[in-house]
């Protein structure tokens, strides 16, 4: 997947010391990440050139200059080659909820995350539009994306419940997670016709925020 995930630059809350910078990855971790990126880049290039179903695993391994064994260590199934940032995407999504500034609602935090992600996609890898077309036109990738979407929804719903003091199986948490993840797609569809994707995204999350306030305000 083209890199569209923004890196967090949120300041520390007023009066709080800045969070310590994470330790830089070691040589082994850097090499592993570079290999994974090389495999994913080679796979996406071949998929966009020839189509997902017409490219074999061995061809991808050869293009990335790795063995098929190494490829499968990083990507256990072929579909995962397209969604190589799945874990990072989920981690950033959960962090948007758990690390939001004091006083910011969960829907507002998810709105800001969605807006940052949209800006990064608009100014990021030019292959992103082609990537979306590849997923939409390939049944195996659509199915994998749907399963990934459901996993992200469940993980986000758990984080929302924990942050809001609600039961883990509260349907309101699942509903918020569902619509928060669906909002960018709905806003983009609106924007494709009317040309105001950002405004549509803000309005959608404003609606979610208003509804969420009625839930959290209950005794």
Language-model segments: what does each one mean?
Residues 66-75:
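Short hydrophobic/aromatic patch on the recognition helix
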Residues 79-81:
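A secondary-structure capping/hinge motif
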Residues 1-50, 54-66, 83, 92:
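Basic, helix-initiating cap at the start of DNA-binding domains
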Residues 91-131:
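Hydrophobic alpha-helical connector segments
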Residues 35, 85, 89, 114, ...:
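Hydrophobic/aromatic residues within well-ordered alpha-helical segments
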Residues 139-164, 171-178:
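Amphipathic alpha-helical packing segments from all-alpha helical-bundle domains
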Residues 121, 163, 187-192:
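Secondary-structure edge/capping motif, primarily at the C-terminal ends of alpha-helices
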Residues 1-22, 158, 193-219:
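C-terminal peripheral helix-coil segments that are non-catalytic and often amphipathic
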